[in-house]
């Protein structure tokens, strides 16, 4: 369906259901659609002298301003009683009453938060927004509240020309096997090994923790397994920093967003980084959207709820095992009319497995594998 068809479908369904979930790909325009639905309800239910109460839930404090900007951008909401609150503070609204509740990025509704939500008396409508809702949460709202779910994933959005199809450049790399500079501990001794040797060593440790967990169901082993796997992906990202700096230099005249593995890596790869640690993050984002700067780097803060203007290139220095995070990150780039995604990755590693999952929804014609950054053409 086109954007207009989904918009009309949602408007036609909102009068017949109290709970609606808009499961739409990042970049689709969920906030605008939610604002239109709110105003439709206001026109249908409330008289001129009445003012509906609206609660909008967001995942982070920075997203409160994003919603204020969106409301202003799309002509306002027909109410003076609008509360924008973070999910962390939802418990403060237990047993409260609102005419309309909007749950932005509703994947943040944990079981405990859903319990609080169930105590809120919603007079007219609950509207959930997400590109990445989990199946069990979707099923809960369908079975408990007969929720109407309207979906549009990445593949459908591209096929129906709701979003542009990006050109995806894959840049396969090989771990070095000749230079001995990496230290690992084996049999209680420090051993100097190669890049490939270090990767194999940490992978063996991950498998050991994993097997220990499945044999014992010891939660400590599970935590060690998952945390070490995360450290492995972070290490892989760090090995690509020199390459990414070359990419940023090559595309210095194009608006580029680089996804990093940590705040520290965001700082190393970009002067204008957007992180929870950087007090200038909001200013950097504004300058980027106003085209005053070309490059920004980020780790997690740009995964959701933040709008980017005309970003042409997305560089995935860090690969994430979370399908939710991957979809959110790709959505940051698909607002440009001809987006480019560049994914450098190490062959025969966990990264290669993640890349294969990432590109499943793209057509084969849009994926180009290159041997050198010089082969990437815009």
Task: State the predicted function of each range.
Residues 332-360:
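Conserved segment of the helicase C-terminal RecA-like domain
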Residues 57-97:
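Inter-Walker segment of RecA-like/P-loop motor cores
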Residues 108-168:
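Post-DEXD/H (motif II) to motif III coupling segment of the RecA-like Helicase ATP-binding lobe
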Residues 98-102, 295-299, 303-320, 325-326, ...:
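A short beta-strand element within the Helicase C-terminal
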Residues 65-69, 255-259, 264-306, 325:
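Conserved helicase ATPase core of P-loop NTP-dependent helicases/translocases
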Residues 1-23:
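Conserved pre-motif I regulatory segment
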Residues 18-21, 154-255, 260-261:
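Interdomain linker/hinge connecting the two RecA-like lobes of the SF2 helicase core
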Residues 26-41, 48-71, 113, 262-264:
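Conserved Walker A/P-loop ATP-binding site and its immediately adjacent core
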């Amino acid at each position: 369906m086109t954007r207009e068809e989904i918009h009309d479908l949602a408007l036609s369904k909102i009068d017949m259901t109290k709970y609606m979930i808009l499961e739409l790909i990042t970049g689709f325009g969920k906030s605008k659609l939610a604002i239109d639905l709110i105003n439709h309800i206001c026109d249908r239910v409330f008289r001129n002298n009445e003012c509906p109460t609206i609660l909008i839930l967001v995942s982070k404090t920075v997203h409160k301003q994003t919603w204020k900007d969106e409301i202003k951008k799309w002509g306002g909401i027909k109410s003076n009683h609008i509360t924008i609150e973070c999910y962390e503070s939802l418990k403060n609204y237990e047993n409260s009453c609102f005419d309309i509740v909007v749950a932005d990025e509703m994947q943040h509704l944990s079981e405990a938060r859903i319990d609080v939500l169930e105590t809120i008396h919603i007079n007219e409508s609950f509207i959930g927004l997400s590109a990445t809702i989990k199946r069990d949460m979707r099923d809960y709202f369908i079975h408990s509240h007969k929720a109407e779910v309207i979906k549009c994933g990445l593949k459908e959005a591209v096929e129906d020309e709701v979003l542009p199809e990006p050109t995806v450049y894959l840049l396969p790399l090989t771990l070095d096997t000749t230079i001995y500079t990496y230290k690992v501990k084996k049999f209680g001794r420090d051993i100097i090994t190669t890049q490939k040797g270090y990767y194999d060593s940490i992978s063996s440790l991950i498998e050991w923790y994993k097997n220990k967990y499945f044999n014992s169901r010891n939660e400590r082993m599970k935590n060690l397994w998952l945390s070490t796997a995360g450290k492995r992906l972070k290490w892989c990202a760090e090995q690509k920093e020199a390459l990414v700096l070359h990419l940023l230099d090559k595309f210095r005249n194009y608006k580029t967003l680089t996804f990093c593995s940590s705040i520290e890596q965001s700082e190393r790869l970009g002067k204008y980084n957007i992180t929870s640690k950087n007090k200038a993050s909001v200013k950097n984002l504004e300058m980027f959207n106003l085209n005053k700067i070309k490059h920004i780097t980020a780790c997690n803060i740009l995964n959701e709820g933040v709008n980017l203007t005309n970003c042409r290139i997305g560089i995935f220095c860090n690969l994430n095992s979370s399908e939710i995070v991957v979809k959110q990150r790709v959505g940051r780039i698909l607002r440009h009319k001809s987006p480019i995604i560049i994914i450098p990755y190490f062959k025969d590693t966990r990264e290669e497995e993640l890349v294969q999952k990432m590109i499943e929804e793209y057509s084969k014609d849009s994926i180009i594998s290159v041997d050198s950054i010089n082969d990437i053409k815009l």
